[in-house]
Every structure is written in structure tokens, then in C-alpha cells.
Amino acid sequence: MILFITACENGPVEYKPESGSVSGKVTFQNIDNWPSSSSIAIALSLYWPPQGAPAAFTSISYDSLIINQNVGSYNYIFENITLNRAYGSIAVSWKDPNDNNSETNQHVLGAYGGSLAAEFWDADSIMLTDDIYEIENLDFIVDLD
């Protein structure tokens, strides 16, 4: 009889994620001003201010809001996001239905870390890495007034 015994190292297992995710909640104030035409979207953009196509985006419908009085909230998540790079912003925008120019028809309504007083130029960037590949609670407020 031959007996083979093998052992493995008891060190930590290193997990290398292939992609990451960011998530949070957008609180919409004054939702009675929700646009009746056109659309509102949330996007994760590579640059700030946004230039070109976003890394990820989704449309937000009025029906998808959790409504309490005149405030609505929307929980978002962007998954399968490329790691080891910075993203310029997460922003909510409104598409002007009377402007066909894709470079001027999106109007920023709010951005993560940004303030209306600074016209959202102070939006925070987001960095996903092999070590920090899931970022949660990137919450911000959009006032539709």
C-alpha cells in the first residue's frame, strides 16, 4: 500500500476581484416638479465635468421612487465596474427634450459630494481598486425646485 499525503499552506487566500460596484441613495426633494416629459438619469462618469459616454448609467422613472410626502428616494447600484481607476463623478441629470445636441442637452441636477452653490464643480471622485472594490452609501440629494 502506498499512501500519499499532501498539505497546503495555511496562509490567507488572496482574492482578486474582476470588477467592482458602487451604490447609494439619491433623495429627490420637491418631486412635484418631476419633469412630465423627457427623462432623468443617474450616471457614473469617467470625467468631471462629464465628457463622452458614461462608464455606467440608468434612467430613473417617477414610478421607481420610494415616496414619502414631497420627497422621493432612489437606490442605485452600478456593478461590473472596471477596477484600478478613478471615476470623476456620480451625477443625476435631466435631458432637455428641446435640445438635440448631445453635448448640451444634459443638465446636472445633483452630484455625489457636489453642492448647488458650486454648481456641482466640487463633486467627489470615486476610486475602485483591487482592495476597495465595493463602495456603498454614496448618498446625495437632488432638489427639483
How should each PLM-predicted stretch be described?
Residues 2-29:
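Bacterial Sec-dependent N-terminal signal peptides
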Residues 49-87:
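Tryptophan-paired
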Residues 138-145:
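Conserved "repeat-terminator" motif of extracellular CCP/Sushi domains
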Residues 83-101:
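A short, solvent-exposed beta-strand micro-motif common in secreted/extracellular proteins
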Residues 95-137:
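Structured interaction patches on ligand/partner-binding surfaces of diverse proteins
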Residues 27, 41-49, 90-96:
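Predominantly extracellular/luminal cell-surface or secreted proteins
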